[in-house]
C-alpha cells in the first residue's frame, strides 16, 4: 500500500518526467533525408557552370541546427568552395566544400560561444583538426512539381561518406540561380555520437538549412 507521502513522490516524478519529455526541444520540422551507402560521382554533365561564393555571407550559407533537452544551437559552416553545373530543369553536377575548422556558433556570445565552438571542433563532434573539411558532391537530380527537385549526393563528415537524397526548391535564372533546402539527418550515421550530459541529452536528428545563390563562373 502506498502512503500519501509515497503517492506525492510518485506524482512528482511523473510530473517531472512529463516536463522533461514535452520540454525536450525537437529538431525543426523538415523532410528526413534518405541515407544510403555512397554512390559514384558522375564526371561532367550538361549545363552552365556557376559558383556560389561571394562577399555577401547571407547570399549563400549552410546552417546546422542541433537540439537538446534545454534548447538548441545554430552553427554556420563557412563555404570554402561551391560550384555546380546547372540547366533550367536540374543540377547535373556540383561540389560544396565546408570549412569545418572555422565553424561559428550563431546564438551565443563571448566565452560561451568560444567554449561551444571548441567542443564542436573536438573529437566529441567533428574532430576538426583531423577532418577540417566537409564535402557534398552531387550524384543525381530528379525534377518534381513546380520548383521542387530531389537532389542526391555524397556527404562526407569526419571521414565518413554517405549518400543522401532530399527535396529542394530550385529556381533557374541564367544570371542568378537559387537553391534552398531544409532537411534532417541522423548524426550517428557519420559517427557523431556524443550524447551530452545525463540531464541535457543531445538529439540525434540534426537539421540542415541550405541557401545558395549563384553567378556564372568567371564573372
Task: List where the protein language model places each region.
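Sec-dependent bacterial lipoprotein signal peptides
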Residues: 1-22
